[in-house]
Amino acid sequence: MLPPFYYKGVSDDGIFAFISGVIDKVGSPALRLFLYHIPPMAVVGFSLDLVGRLITAYPGTLAGLKDSSGDWSNTAALLERFPGFAVFPGSEVFLLDGLRKGAAGCITASANVNVLGIRKLYDNWQGPQAETLQAEITTLRNTLQAYPMVPALKRIVAHYHNDPNWAAVRPPLVPLGQAQSAALIADLGKLGFTLGERPQAKAA
């Protein structure tokens, strides 16, 4: 759940009142809420103190937080201050460091095209290949970030499935142009990238 972000410069008290109002109105013990901290987009975010207040007020409801601040120091502070609280870095760049501090995993847009590489690190983060696996997924992420992220991900799927319909995006986003698309696919080719597919079920 995002904080209310239309008004900027609002206080922790105001955000607390908004979140608590939603929880109280739902009024269900089954509710599990994940906070979405993404100040690069929303500008408004969840401070450490506010997260602590919400966890204390709703210990059975506040289930976790996705930290898309891009600021490792903030993610690390969340992990250190709230052990047992499910914190997910918003980029796989921080996956290994996060897991070593108790992160639950990561929630990242680029998993749409690199789920196998990211999952491999998640499964082997305590093994001898962990640093190498992290370097590989970081290199790919940095390549993707050199382009508008969502149009780039859509273009990759379109290219590897040979289906241009996948490249469509909703306004106000616009698809990558021909030059950018060609450059992106060339950059991926240099990395030996392939779009991993799920195994096909065998016929009985």
Model segments located where?
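Short, solvent-exposed amphipathic alpha-helices that sit
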Residues: 17-21, 50, 152
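Solvent-exposed, flexible loop/coil residues
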Residues: 11, 50, 76, 173, ...
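A generic, residue-level signal for flexible/boundary positions that often mark functional hotspots
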Residues: 4, 40, 107, 167-170
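Active-site beta->alpha loop and helix N-cap motifs at the rims of alpha/beta catalytic domains
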Residues: 1-44, 199
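Hydrophobic alpha-helix-in-membranes signature
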Residues: 2-3, 38, 88, 150, ...
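Catalytic alpha/beta core domains of metabolic enzymes, predominantly
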Residues: 23-31, 38-147
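C-terminal alpha-helical cap/extension of soluble enzyme domains
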Residues: 103, 110-204
